Amino acid sequence: MPDDFDAIVVGSGPNGLAAAVTLTAAGLRVLVIEGAATVGGGCRTEKLTLPGFWHDVCSAAHPLAMASPFFRQFGLAARGVRLVSAPVEFAQPLDGGRAAVVTRSVTETAERLGADGRAYRRLFGPLTDDAAALTELLLSPIRRPPARVTPGLVPFSMNGLRSAAGIARRFRTPEARALLSGAAAHGMLPLTSVPTGAVGLMLTTLAHAFGWPVAEGGSARITQAMADAVTAAGGRIETGHWVRSLAELPPARAVLLDVTPRALLAMAGGQLPVGYRDALRRFRYGAGVCKVDFALAGPVPWLNDSCRQAGTLHLGGTFEEIAAAEAAVAAGRHPDAPYVLITQPGVADPSRAPAGCQTLWA
């Protein structure tokens, strides 16, 4: 392959690889450059603890691998990637052995919520029925109003512009309020802030419509399939090459940077408008996260059976307790009882660990 390209992609996370897949499929000459030894960015799988235990380095559950327009067209299954879901998509343990539980079925989930069952069905039924159109809209560039109003767009717009705390007022039971808080807390914002309503609604809708699956064998299977598609179409991938400046890149008609704001400023600052450079310097990263990988001798003995069957768990207690924890983080304090996101890949994918053992992502 010649050393001049139609496009160079710096960074091989899922976004960078998606760009490379799209460009090579169009017949363009593409070079992907990755600083790490392997492709994938946060979507990688490595042996981080004991022999025989495979752990996802960052991303673990992948509802958007089922839902996004790109992946629906890319066809992971046809490329040998199996996405597998646990019997329970996510659960949230509560005191006394109780739990808030979300399964693929809106009806089954609602039946577990007692007095809040009807309100839950009214909220998530229309959203789930229209999940594909909603996902495509939310993942598209915001250039113009949608060409058509789909059935789920109106209820999502009305509720998605509210905070999780505002939506939670629809519910009376601790279980219904808790499951909304666990999903909304993925936004890493106070639950009184407006974006958290949309986060909670969309993630719960995805659980019902597509599931929260893991990739059999590890998240790296997803990005490796994307990398294989790039090279099969004539693209080239270089790993172990940290780009310090755009000046070191070979000639290309376009350069796409799948990097952080600070990395963009470092490698391209001199070629960016002054106002944009200042915006990059002012960019504030979100709250810090500590992630721990466990190699377990067996499954976690949760008190609630549904928690033992869950692929993902949200720890933190009731809506009020999780709201207090997220508010403390936003105020720059360490909460006494932090919100903890857990994935149990082995519930759906026993291949991650030796027989009888499991991995835990927390």
Placement of each model-derived feature along the sequence:
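Helical element adjacent to the flavin cofactor pocket in flavoenzyme catalytic cores
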Residues: 202-247, 253
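Short, well-ordered coil/turn residues at beta-beta hairpins
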Residues: 11, 170, 258-259
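Rossmann-like flavin
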Residues: 95-195
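N-terminal glycine-rich phosphate/pyrophosphate-binding loop and immediately adjacent elements
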Residues: 3-133
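Mid-domain catalytic core of redox enzymes
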Residues: 235, 239-354
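Helix-rich C-terminal "cap"/substrate-channel and partner-interaction subdomain
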Residues: 121-146, 263, 338-361
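Residues forming anionic-ligand binding surfaces in small-molecule and nucleic-acid pockets
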Residues: 196-207, 355-358, 362
